[in-house]
Regions:
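Extracellular structured ligand-interaction cores
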Residues: 4, 9-11, 76, 141, ...
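Aromatic- and Gly/Pro-enriched helix-to-coil junctions and flexible linker segments
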Residues: 26-27, 89
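Residues within well-ordered beta-strands of beta-sheet-rich folds
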Residues: 13-15, 93, 208-210
Length: 214
């Protein structure tokens, strides 16, 4: 997260809400997992190799595994446990794009550190009332971004035992922002950079959609 850098952000629009399970079902019902034009080449190879046809932990289009056992999928809740590849394909399906990490960071800095975090005790993603969305900008799910996990300009590794963290991980991974329902409030901040490989699905990940403003 250091050193501090200046980044130019062009005008953009960001959906405050996470993409919902109902929206993901629309993607599935429109044959989204079988349309190569929506997918990055590596993503297409990944879903075909591992027969990915739905979010991780979905049993079918009605039920899923959760911390509480098998549950009926709530269409209003944010879709979770999706890979970067899936998030990217969905954004293309909706004729949108994934936000950059700096767009999400800017969004987070404009809002209080409130949301569905660990202390709330929900232990799951929840639907947010649109009227209170700005008061719930943190937590719920880690938000995929289109940004590669790379060092900031002027970055220098820590010394001694911490020297391996984080530079050795800055290879072929993407940044996620905002925290999740499993993130303690004192652990998250607008600048926090989480990172996973584009095929990873086990983490508490979701997506918001962005677009350019002309």
């Amino acid at each position: 997260e250091s050193p501090t850098n200046s980044v130019e952000i062009c005008p953009f629009e960001l959906n405050i809400d996470f993409v919902s399970n109902n929206e993901w079902l629309e993607f599935i019902n429109n044959d989204g997992y079988n349309r190569p034009e929506l997918w990055l080449s590596d993503g297409w190879d990944f879903i075909k190799k591992y027969d990915v046809k739905k979010p991780l932990y979905w049993l079918d289009n009605k039920f899923k595994f959760s911390f509480f056992g098998v549950e009926r999928i709530d269409g209003s809740e944010p879709v979770s446990h999706i890979s970067f590849y899936e998030a990217d394909a969905f954004s293309r399906f909706k004729k949108k794009r994934l936000p950059t990490e700096f767009e999400i960071e800017y969004f987070l800095t404009q809002n209080k550190k409130k949301g569905n975090l660990l202390e709330n005790g929900n232990f799951k993603e929840i639907s947010i009332n649109k009227q209170n969305a700005m008061e719930n900008s943190y937590g719920n799910l880690w938000c995929w971004t289109s940004s590669n996990y790379l060092p900031y300009s002027g970055y220098k590794p820590f010394s001694e035992k911490l020297s391996e963290y984080n530079q050795k991980f800055m290879c072929n991974q993407f940044v996620l922002k905002g925290g999740s329902y499993a993130t303690p409030k004192n652990h998250i901040r607008s600048t926090y950079r989480n990172f996973y490989y584009p095929s990873d699905r086990w983490q508490f990940s979701g997506l918001r959609l962005a677009s350019d403003l002309k």
